[in-house]
Structures are given as C-alpha cells and as structure tokens.
Amino acid sequence: MSLSDSPSKSGNTGKDLISNNEAKNHEDEETHQKKRRRRTTDAEATLLEQYFLKTPKPSLIERQELSKKLKSSMTPRELQIWFQNKRQSLRRSNCLSRNRLEGTGENSLLRRKSTLTLCETSTGQAELFFQSWPLHSQSVVGEMIHHEQDDYNKENKQQKVVDTTKDISRGSNGNEDSAAHQELEECARSLVELQQQCNDH
C-alpha cells in the first residue's frame, strides 16, 4: 500500500492536500501583491512639507508619530519612502541649479575665444590688445573686430594688424587659467618683436 492510497490520520486524502496548498498559495499571492499607489492630499502634502523642513530624516519613532497625525493614511514605511524621495528631489534640484549658475555641466570646461590684436600706432609703437569672449558669441566677436578694424583703418592708413585667435579651456583649476594667460603673453611678446623687426627692415 502506497502513501497516496492510504488516508491520512486527519482524514484528508492527497487530493485534499493539493487543493489546500493551492488555496494557501492563492492567499499568499494576494498578500504579496503591490498596494495600489495613492496620491497624498493637499493637507497631507502640506503637513509633510512642514515636517520635512524641520526634520529631513525622521527616525522610526518620529515616522510612527507622524503616521498617527495623518490618521494612518500613510504607514511609517510609506513615510520613509516619501522622505527619501523628497531628499533625492532636493539634491537633484540643487545640482541643476548649481549647473545653471556655472553655465556648464559638472565635468565640462568653459570654452572661451581669445583674440590677441597687435596694432601699430601713428608713432610707430606697437600696442597689444587682448579680449576674451564665450565661444557662443564668436561670430559677433569676429564681426565686431572686423568693424573696429575698418574704422581704425579709415582713421590711420598705416595701421598693421595681426590677429591671433586661440581656444582656451578654462576649468575650475586656476593653474590652467594662468598657464593659458602665460602662453598668450609669450605669444604677444613674440608678435611685438616680430612687428619691431619688420619696422627695422
């Protein structure tokens, strides 16, 4: 005689045990299903916002008290998730605000267009002009320099202009910025020397 053929001591057969297990599994599935999401009311949101300003990371006891104030509309676990989401949202908005103020992303560099102009004055001395603009205004800068040079050429026919343009990466590190300026100064010195050599010949 096999086990499946013999009745159990409780009087259940094998078929009864299977149906009991199925019923138990069905109950477990219902309890493990996710709760439907519900939106907080305006009153709840106001209370939670005020509480968040005082205590952005409440303890379990504080969340339980807050749950009682909300008349159990939110469990302490739901409150914990709400506060986590609120802190993350605040961090994200602070990061976006900071990036907007800097004008660039966190890891990108601010690109600038620098123009070095060497002009000979009416007395024969060389003058050096240095200007720097953001890259997005390059075309405006080029037109402005062109118009300024045309106006200056009309007034002083003997003007000789040498334009040197260079892209400079300027990051948050001051060493990069000073190195770029040193490089431009060296370039300017060599341009002045070149201009003086041309005048001597």
From Swiss-Prot:
Residues 33-92 bind DNA. Keywords: Cell cycle, DNA-binding, Homeobox, Nucleus, Phosphoprotein, Repressor, Transcription, Transcription regulation. One of its GO terms (molecular function) is transcription corepressor activity. Its main location: nucleus. Component of the MBF transcription factor complex. Phosphorylated in response to hydroxyurea. Phosphorylation inhibits the repressor activity and is dependent on rad3. However, the regulation of yox1 by rad3 is probably indirect. It holds the Pfam family Homeodomain. This is MBF complex negative regulatory component yox1. Negative regulatory component of the MBF transcription factor complex involved in cell-cycle G1/S phase-specific gene expression and more particularly DNA replication checkpoint-dependent gene expression. It is found in: Nucleus. SMART domains: HOX (SM00389). Induction: Expression is induced during S phase and depends on the MBF transcription factor complex. Residues 1-22 have a biased composition (Polar residues).
